[in-house]
Amino acid sequence: MIFIMKLKNLLPIFCFFLVSFSISSAQKCGKTGLFKPNDKYDINRHLLLSSLASNVSARGGFYNASIGQGPDRLYASGTCIQGSEPELCSACIDSAFIRVIKKCHNQTEALDWSSFNEEYPCMIRYSNRSFFGLLEMTPFFKNYNATDFQVNLTEFYQKWEALMLGVIADAISSPNPKFYGAGTGKIGIQTVYAFVLCSKDISPWNCSRCLRGNVDNYKLSCSGKPRGHSFSPSCYMRWDLYQFYGFIEYRASPTLPREKGRISELSDDGGKISTRNILGITVALAFFITVLLVLGYALSRRRKAYQEFATENDITTSGSLQFDFKAIEAATNNFQKSNKLGHGGFGEVFKGTFPNGTEVAVKRLSKISGQGEEEFKNEVLLVAKLQHRNLVRLLGFSVEGEEKILVYEYMPNKSLDYFLFDHRRRGQLDWRTRYNIIRGVTRGILYLHQDSRLTIIHRDLKAGNILLDVDMNPKIADFGVARNFRVDQTEATTGRVVGTFGYMPPEYVANGQFSMKSDVYSFGVLILEIIVGKKSSSFHEIDGSVGNLVTYVWRLWNNESFLELVDPAMGESYDKDEVIRCIHISLLCVQENPADRPTMSTVFQMLTNTFLTLPVPQLPGFVFRVRSEPNPLAERLEPGPSTTMSFACSIDDASITSVDLR
């Protein structure tokens, strides 16, 4: 009976731990006005907010911008922790974008202070009025635990406020304010953790004013509640009894007063709790926490498995904008041929212009393509989760009957092959531009293989899938045949080979095996094409043998006459050492044995560290020899007369839809 009474006394504490898992985000939709779905303001909102993740993470944790004119003009900003991992920042901004679009679906103003997976805080905000650089302390929002805190509140809040002020001072300390702070302190038997964050476009003084206002408002309205957070448009504050953001260093606050004695913890009747009772409470509480954690873990695993099963193939949960098909038709002038930019194995690409003047690239999947639906779903689900300056950005999609549309950011300079393989235009690609393209593509592939939340094998790297922005910066595109690897997965095998001839490694063509090293091989071929200025397939009969670009370069390398490779269109204005080093790296990438090929991380080091000694390249894949018998697989790959070679593939680099390996 006594034990049951003690358990009764523990229920408020037990409820506290239950409630403590609830704080993760807070979205506030403005009441200043509404807009109609798919009008100019709605389009501007999606276009600007969908680009926040990449821009905020690429600019050190803060970015603001506006888009549109007159009443359709929209202002937006994003805030992360300065100096934090770009991938965490990007993921948090992306999740906030998805939430605010869903909850504030037609409000002209909204903000979201949130955390990604309870591990990383960030903020996004948009409005139809300019708020850049303005201190805005209202409206004030709060969230707190409903359980009463059983402590001496006067003594507790004296030290709690000292901790908060110390954290605020850390956030605005000169000479380089961080605009965020984190601290911890011991108050009685409790360890308290605190965190603050300000929008970086306000001054340090205004940051302090905003946070102090939050502290005062919280004390007035949430006194006696253990844990909580409060925020206004310009700043955010959170405190709790556990280390809620695991990656942040919580410094012991220098302003926290030294304790003169223990804070008296009161029982329900107002008396002191004895040592024996404290021990009993501690044991019982430990038991409840253990049970809670076990149950919580089991339930979370079950819920996560169900959610993954339910959403794995649902593109509506991808976070991308679903455009109205009629808006796409209007933007492309009903897919008029004059707006056509090109075509691929699964459809055509058109230029589109929205009413606000925003230009986009619209990929219309072929209705008769056997793999079109799979390609479409794969591209939406993968690319929506990727954010990098060297990857083309997916703005959204549209589904209308048999029509399947992908909407991308528009690249005014089209693709690399548009310049590289045209005898007139390739003169515009000097060596510095080509070298920057090589380095940019390296960064993009490295992100796919190593630095993103997913491990992505592209499987179709080629000049036609490298788009160029207005400054000729490269962006990798076309993820229709890409595959996502598990964390512990290094390779996979497929019975259907997809990709482009001339770029596919021998183990993939012959056996359907692909891995990160498959992309490395394709990248090696791409480097050679950039240097030579010709397609890999343009090198045929060489000294009585069937050849390709890899064969040709290997022979010149062995003869030490590799500078004959250099595209004459570049003239003499190129760095010979850089060119030779790039040729050397490319030959390392196209080695026959995948284990001999470097990783993209190593390739990046080879390109950026000229003092790094490069190993001697071994025999590359696809060193062709004359063979009298026809190759049946090659006949299936490329219609027409069969091509004789030592591996089952065509020397043409035409794109293919699929090949069934038997």
Swiss-Prot record:
Question: Which N-terminal residues, if any, form the signal peptide?
Answer: 1-26
* Chain ranges on the Cytoplasmic side, renumbered to this chain: 299-662
One of this protein's Pfam families, by short name?
Answer: PK_Tyr_Ser-Thr
| Residues modified by glycosylation | 55, 64, 106, 128, 145, 152, 206
Membrane-side (Extracellular) residue stretches: 27-277
* Keywords carried by this UniProt record: ATP-binding, Glycoprotein, Kinase, Membrane, Nucleotide-binding, Receptor, Repeat, Serine/threonine-protein kinase, Signal, Transferase, Transmembrane, Transmembrane helix
Q: Which residues form the Protein kinase domain?
A: 335-612
Query: Where does the record place the Gnk2-homologous domain?
Result: 27-131, 137-244
Q: Name one GO cellular component term.
A: membrane
Record-given protein name: Putative cysteine-rich receptor-like protein kinase 16
Native source organism of the sequence: Arabidopsis thaliana (Mouse-ear cress)
